Amino acid sequence: MRFDVVTIFPEYLSVLDVSLLGRARREGLVDVHVHDLRDFTVDRHRTVDDTPYGGGAGMVMKPEPWALALEHVAAQGPAAPAPADPASAEPGDRPVLLVPTPSGERFTQRFARELAGREHVAIACGRYEGIDERVFGWAEELFEVRLVSLGDYVLNGGEVAALAMIEAVGRLVPGVVGNPASLVEESHEDGLLEYPVYTKPADWRGRAVPPVLLSGDHGKVAAWRRTQQEERTRERRPDLWAAFDSED
């Protein structure tokens, strides 16, 4: 699986060289390429932003360098070329372009699993007041464009979100996580939060591990864990519980 990230701070992505994703990159399971947006500027000042039409605070990222950068990224990936009529493209025909933004759709575990089945994912990391809106419509000629948000808060740029999404998607690629079973029992995989976990010693500072986990009865353990998932989700994430309860 290939990721391409376009940013004005390429060094921000260096953390992808460590831990499980770093190993996955070295083993060829996940391929990550980071591109400096300033390399696609055409003026001697390497300008990537300008003042907004209509006035207002801050600066807006210019469309010209983004177009050149995204054309370059689209040409590098393994996906099939875009069809002549983008509207007729089937899902999976084009690489996915993720644009982190507080005004995007929510990035979820289900979304991550969907992306893990794709060959090529690009991420456009905006800064300042964002990227010129025209870029997104134009990019649909080359990509399946998805504007995404990690949550209801604002970050300084898209790099933190890019790191989170690459890890969320990359760890679902076969071989990245050593024990595939651990992916099945995590929070959000079945619409619920994960159950609490414990390890040795059985009694620590007067706090004991729930007896059912020491019983050796796999059926009782499974039932206890399911109850804990439901109670934890109902208490901590009523929004998830409402969605789960309506499907049940």
UniProtKB/Swiss-Prot annotation:
Under the heading InterPro entries, the entry gives: Alpha/beta_knot_MTases, tRNA_m1G_MeTrfase_C_sf, tRNA_m1G_MeTrfase_TrmD, tRNA_m1G_MTases_N, tRNA_MeTrfase_TRMD/TRM10
- Basic and acidic residues composition-biased segments: 227-239
Reaction it catalyzes: guanosine(37) in tRNA + S-adenosyl-L-methionine = N(1)-methylguanosine(37) in tRNA + S-adenosyl-L-homocysteine + H(+)
Q: Where can this protein be found? A: Cytoplasm
Q: Which GO terms describe its molecular function?
A: tRNA (guanine(37)-N1)-methyltransferase activity
What Gene3D superfamilies does the record tag this protein with?
3.40.1280.10, tRNA(m1g37)methyltransferase, domain 2 (1.10.1270.20)
One Pfam family assigned to this protein is tRNA_m1G_MT
Enumerate the SUPFAM superfamilies for this protein.
alpha/beta knot (SSF75217)
Give positions of region: Disordered.
224-248
EC assignment: the record states 2.1.1.228
Show the GO cellular component annotation of the record.
Answer: cytosol
| Primary enzyme class | transferase
UniProt keyword annotation of Ribosomal protein present: no
User: Its biological function?
Assistant: Specifically methylates guanosine-37 in various tRNAs.
Describe the family membership recorded for this protein in Swiss-Prot or TrEMBL: Belongs to the RNA methyltransferase TrmD family.
How this chain assembles, per its entry, is: Homodimer.
Q: What is this protein called?
A: tRNA (guanine-N(1)-)-methyltransferase
- Organism annotation: Micrococcus luteus (strain ATCC 4698 / DSM 20030 / JCM 1464 / CCM 169 / CCUG 5858 / IAM 1056 / NBRC 3333 / NCIMB 9278 / NCTC 2665 / VKM Ac-2230)
